């Protein structure tokens, strides 16, 4: 049996999230179905992807990582007439079978001890907002949340700073069965993307076209892991602060008392993108997976 690491990206707009669900189009279901066709393993449970970070319906990923265990003989059969290694052949075939909203960026033999979910050191998410400071670009409808209010980025950053460190995010997340909402946030900040005009040499003002993300508000958050709905709920709370509906003291109170209730529900999914998954050195993978499986406490 060979464990393979798969790096991929996807536009989540037309998917019901990552996780396979009967009767729903999902990223996991689409990739697994293609793998079964390539390997001629029709059993639905024969090839199961384990993912670094499950994304909800409408959420995107520019760098997602998963692993799958494939029988050695089955992997060898992927070559067929190709003058490629088995792994290269599988990547080529899988890439060709993907719809336009999924891209396979790489397949490799995973090092010993690698687990896409439990070996990960940290995950990076970015949430994008178009507020009243910038004219609305309809091309962003699937990739940014829109508001006709101008948001106070200084107040939003004051709230975001309170999330740094090890905390119980019970006010902003749902725990998995038997799990907790304790997580360690390493980075959390808001910034406005500078205007980046696409202006070539010798072009006049009429060609002064801003890059598509110019002026957007972006929330970047890095943590060892995230509980369900955690990022979108934190964004939603920061937005309430940025609009002046709530103050930073209210946000601080939610951090102090981890109680889930309606005022800290998740914001719309389309603005959220999983941007990066980081892993330790190969010789630290197994130990990392063992540590992260332990139930966290404060």
UniProtKB/Swiss-Prot annotation:
Molecular function GO labels: RNA binding; tRNA pseudouridine(38-40) synthase activity
GO terms, biological process: tRNA pseudouridine synthesis
Keyword Metal-binding: no
SUPFAM superfamilies per record: Pseudouridine synthase (SSF55120)
EC number(s) stated in the UniProt entry for this protein: 5.4.99.12
Superkingdom as given in the UniProt entry: Bacteria
Reaction(s) catalysed (UniProt annotation): uridine(38/39/40) in tRNA = pseudouridine(38/39/40) in tRNA
Binding site for substrate: 125
Keywords recorded for this protein, A-Z: Isomerase, tRNA processing
Bridged cysteine pairs (disulfide): none
Transmembrane segments: none
Pfam families recorded: PseudoU_synth_1
Subunit details: Homodimer.
PANTHER family on file: PSEUDOURIDYLATE SYNTHASE, TRNA PSEUDOURIDINE SYNTHASE-LIKE 1
Role, per record: Formation of pseudouridine at positions 38, 39 and 40 in the anticodon stem and loop of transfer RNAs.
Protein name: tRNA pseudouridine synthase A
Gene from which the chain derives: truA
């Amino acid at each position: 049996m060979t464990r393979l690491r798969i790096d991929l990206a996807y536009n989540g707009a037309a998917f019901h999230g990552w996780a396979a669900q009967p009767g729903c189009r999902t990223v996991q279901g689409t990739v697994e179905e293609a793998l079964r066709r390539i390997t001629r393993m029709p059993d639905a449970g024969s090839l199961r992807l384990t993912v670094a970070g499950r994304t909800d319906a409408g959420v995107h990923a520019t760098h997602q990582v998963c692993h799958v265990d494939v029988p050695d003989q089955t992997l060898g059969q992927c070559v067929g007439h190709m003058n490629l290694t088995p792994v290269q052949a599988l990547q080529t075939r899988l890439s060709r079978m993907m719809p336009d909203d999924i891209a396979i960026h790489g397949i490799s033999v995973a090092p010993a001890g690698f687990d896409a979910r439990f070996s990960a050191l940290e995950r990076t998410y970015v949430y994008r907002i178009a507020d009243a400071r910038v004219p609305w670009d309809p091309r962003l409808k699937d990739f940014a949340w829109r508001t006709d209010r101008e948001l106070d980025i200084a107040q939003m950053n004051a709230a975001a700073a309170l999330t740094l460190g090890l905390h119980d995010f019970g006010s902003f997340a749902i725990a998995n069965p038997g799990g907790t909402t304790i997580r360690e946030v390493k980075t959390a900040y808001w910034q406005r993307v500078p205007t980046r005009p696409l202006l070539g040499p010798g072009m006049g003002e009429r060609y002064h076209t801003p890059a598509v993300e110019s002026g957007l508000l972006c929330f970047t958050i890095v943590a060892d892991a995230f509980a369900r709905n955690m990022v979108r709920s934190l964004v939603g709370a920061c937005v309430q602060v940025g609009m002046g509906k709530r103050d930073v003291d209210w946000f601080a109170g939610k951090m102090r008392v981890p109680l889930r209730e309606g005022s800290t529900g998740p914001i719309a999914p389309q603005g959220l993108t999983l941007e990066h998954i980081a892993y330790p050195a190969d010789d630290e993978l197994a130990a990392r997976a063992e540590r992260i499986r332990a139930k966290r406490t404060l």
